[in-house]
Amino acid sequence: MSDTKTSGLYRSIHAQPQAVRELLRDWDGPSQAAEQLAQTGRIFLAGIGTSFHAATVGEYLLRFAGVDAWAVRSFEFALYPRPLREDDGVIVVSHRGSKLHGNLALQRAIASGVRTVGITGRGSKMQGEHIIIQTVDQEVSSTHSISYVGAMTRLAQVAARLAALSGRTKEAKALEQGLAQLPAVMEAMLAREDEVRQVANDAVAHGRRLYYIGAGPNSVTGPEGALKAKEAAYVTAEGFELEQAIHGPQVAFEAEDLVIPVCVRGAAQSRMADLLLASSEIGSHTWLIGEAPSEETAALFDGNRWKLFSINYSTDLPEELTPLLTVLPLQLLADFLATARGTNADSFRTDQAAYKNAGLRFRI
C-alpha cells in the first residue's frame, strides 16, 4: 500500500527542487558534451518511456538553441534505423542504463562513429568511451520522477552551452536564467499538494477516467502524466498531444471523466482555448495545469467541475523549460491516486504474482 508520507515516489518528487539546485552547480559534463555536439550538423535524442519524454523535451530545448534536433524512440533507433551521417550526434537518455533497446541504441551510435552522449543516473550501468553526464541517484520507486526532471535539467544545460558556443547569447542567457528560477517555483508548487490530493480523491471516489493533454514542449507532459498514473495507481489514463486529442479522442470524453490540460504561455494557447470550450459543451470535469488561455476560458473555472492549478513563473521563462514545472502536480497526482486506491506506487506491480510473472516473459 502506498503512503504519501513514505512512498519512494513521494520522497523523490519533493527532492526535485534541491536536486535541480545541485545539478546547476555542475556544468562540467554539459559543457564537455556541448563542445563535442557543437561539431555536429544534426542531433538525435533517443529514449524509452519517460526517458523518451525527456528526449522530446530535449529536442525542443536544442531547437531553441538553434540545433537541428530530433527525438526518437530507442527501439525505433536501434531496429528501424534512419541512416546516420558522419556529422550526426546522438544523445541517449536512460534512468539506469540497463534497458535493452536503450543499450542497443547506444551501441549503434558508438559503432557508427558519431559523437555520442549518454545522460543517465548515478550508479548507472551505462558504459563506454562516449561522454556520460550523470543526473541523480537511482530512485527507490519504479515510477520515475526525479530522474526525469534531472535528465531535462541536464539537457537544458547542454542546450544553453550549445547556444553560447554558436553565438546565440540571448538564448543561452534565457536558458541559464530560466533554470536558476526553477527550484524556488518548484518548492512553491509542491507546497500546494493538498490541492492535488483533493483532485485525486475525487477522481478515485467517482471512478473517473483521466485524459491528459499538452502541446509543444508539453506535448509529452500529457503522456508522462498518464504514464505515472498507470504505473503508480493502475488506473485508466491516456495522454495526448493537443491536436491529436481534438482529432477523434475527444468524442470519447464523457461528462464524468477528468480532463487534465497543460496550458502555458506559448503558440498553442488559442488552440487549447478551442479544446476547453469544446470540453465545456461536453461537461467533463477539468483540472488545468498552468493558466487559462483566454478570458472566455478563464470564466469556466468555477472551482467545482473546473479547477485550476496555476504556476507562477516569470514572463521571460522560455516555454521550453516549462515541462520541468508542469510535470510536478501530475507526479503528485499519481502518488495520491495510488494512496486513494490502496496501490503500491513504487513496485511496478511486481508485488502481485501475475504481474511479476508477466515481467519475466520479456527483458525491458
PLM segments and residue spans:
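Alpha-helical transmembrane segments of integral membrane proteins
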Residues: 46, 214-217, 321, 325
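Active-site phosphate/pyrophosphate-binding segments
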Residues: 4-42, 132-258, 268, 341-364
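Glycine-rich phosphate-binding loops that contact phosphosugars or nucleotide phosphates
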Residues: 27-29, 35-182, 215, 258, ...
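Peripheral docking tails and interdomain loops at the edges
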Residues: 312-364
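Short N-terminal signal/transit or membrane-insertion segments
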Residues: 20, 75, 319-320
